[in-house]
């Protein structure tokens, strides 16, 4: 896996699924291929994206700034600076300075990533902020190691909370989680519909699922009643995708 492919993988792992994720993936590909060289327009686009957390925007802004060649005097963006200030916690800044000193001694992506992984997300974000604000300099490879370590920590915490949600023993939470997942699957089906032959059928199944979830929420049902809902939807989606030769993984 090339360095830029690895960076793209880690960064996309913290972006919520949906049309925006596909758009960001395309922007990253263009930036890494040298096809998008207007940093100012790119940052303006990023600033106005919905759904993304401030930290995710900050990380993406940092990656774009590292990669796109720009004029030396180009102003730093406030939304990136605010996201990479470690929540204003002086402890994060102290740790960030210590981490920065260690990163100065590193020369490889993997070396930098390994060093960075032992720090908290707040300290990692603050360290990115130091570099972004030109208060310190490291090689691009080392900066990317810092980015990937931060994304890995964020993705790990998201995965842990997802696992806790799945294994929770509270039937009401499990019931709601199944309905949320069913809704998301229906949304994915609608987004994939396009103008294919199966589009009408897929839209119909997705619409029925949405109605079912809405009805279950409106009238209230026993928690066990939603058990098969998500699985039925996933099976339908998988069947349609198989027919079209599209892989299923991203919707599991």
From Swiss-Prot:
Statement: the UniProt record of this protein carries the keyword Membrane: yes
Lineage top rank: taxon: Viruses
InterPro entries per record: Flu_matrix_M1 (IPR036039), Flu_matrix_M1_C (IPR013188), Flu_matrix_M1_N (IPR001561), Flu_matrix_M1_N_sub1 (IPR015423), Flu_matrix_M1_N_sub2 (IPR015799), INFV_M1 (IPR037533)
Keyword tags: Host nucleus, Membrane, RNA-binding, Viral matrix protein, Virion
GO molecular function, one term: structural constituent of virion
A Gene Ontology BP annotation from the UniProt entry: viral budding from plasma membrane
Compartments (UniProt record): Virion membrane; Host nucleus
Membrane topology, from the record: Peripheral membrane protein
Region feature RNP-binding, mapped onto this chain: 165-252
Cross-referenced SMART domains: Flu_M1_C
Region listing for Membrane-binding, in residue ranges: 1-164
Chain location of the short sequence motif Nuclear localization signal per the record: 101-105
GO CC term (a single one): virion membrane
Keyword Protein biosynthesis: no
Oligomeric and partner information: Homodimer and homomultimer. Interacts with NEP. Binds ribonucleocapsid by both interacting with genomic RNA and NP protein. May interact with HA and NA. Cannot bind NP without genomic RNA.
Family the UniProt entry places it in: Belongs to the influenza viruses Matrix protein M1 family.
Function: Plays critical roles in virus replication, from virus entry and uncoating to assembly and budding of the virus particle. M1 binding to ribonucleocapsids (RNPs) in nucleus seems to inhibit viral transcription. Interaction of viral NEP with M1-RNP is thought to promote nuclear export of the complex, which is targeted to the virion assembly site at the apical plasma membrane in polarized epithelial cells. Interactions with NA and HA may bring M1, a non-raft-associated protein, into lipid rafts. Forms a continuous shell on the inner side of the lipid bilayer in virion, where it binds the RNP. Determines the virion's shape: spherical or filamentous. Clinical isolates of influenza are characterized by the presence of significant proportion of filamentous virions, whereas after multiple passage on eggs or cell culture, virions have only spherical morphology. Filamentous virions are thought to be important to infect neighboring cells, and spherical virions more suited to spread through aerosol between hosts organisms.
HAMAP family: INFV_M1 (MF_04068)
Record's miscellaneous remark: Most abundant protein in virion. When expressed alone can form virus-like particles in transfected cells.
Name listed for the protein in its UniProt record: Matrix protein 1
Organism: Influenza A virus (strain A/Budgerigar/Hokkaido/1/1977 H4N6)
Primary gene name: M
């Amino acid at each position: 896996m090339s360095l830029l492919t690895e960076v793209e993988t880690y960064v996309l792992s913290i972006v919520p699924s949906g049309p925006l994720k596909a758009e960001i993936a395309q922007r990253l590909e263009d930036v890494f291929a040298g096809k998008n060289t207007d940093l100012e327009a790119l940052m303006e686009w990023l600033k106005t994206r919905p759904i993304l957390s401030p930290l995710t925007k900050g990380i993406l802004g940092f990656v774009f700034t590292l990669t796109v060649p720009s004029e030396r005097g180009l102003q730093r963006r406030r939304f990136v600076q605010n996201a990479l200030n470690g929540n204003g916690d002086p402890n994060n800044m102290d740790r960030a300075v210590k981490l920065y000193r260690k990163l100065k001694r590193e020369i490889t992506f993997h070396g930098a990533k390994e060093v960075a992984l032992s720090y908290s997300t707040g300290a990692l974000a603050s360290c990115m902020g130091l570099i972004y604000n030109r208060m310190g300099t490291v090689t691009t490879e080392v900066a990317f190691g810092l980015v990937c370590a931060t994304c890995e920590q964020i993705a790990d915490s998201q995965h842990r909370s997802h696992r806790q949600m799945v294994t929770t023993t509270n039937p009401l939470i499990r019931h709601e989680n199944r309905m949320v997942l069913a809704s998301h699957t229906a949304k994915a089906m609608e987004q994939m519909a396009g103008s294919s032959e199966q589009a009408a059928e897929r839209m119909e199944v997705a619409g029925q699922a949405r109605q079912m979830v809405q009805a279950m929420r409106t009238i209230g049902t026993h928690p066990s009643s939603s058990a098969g809902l998500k699985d039925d939807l996933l099976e339908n989606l998988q069947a349609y995708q198989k027919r079209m030769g599209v892989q299923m993984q991203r919707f599991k």
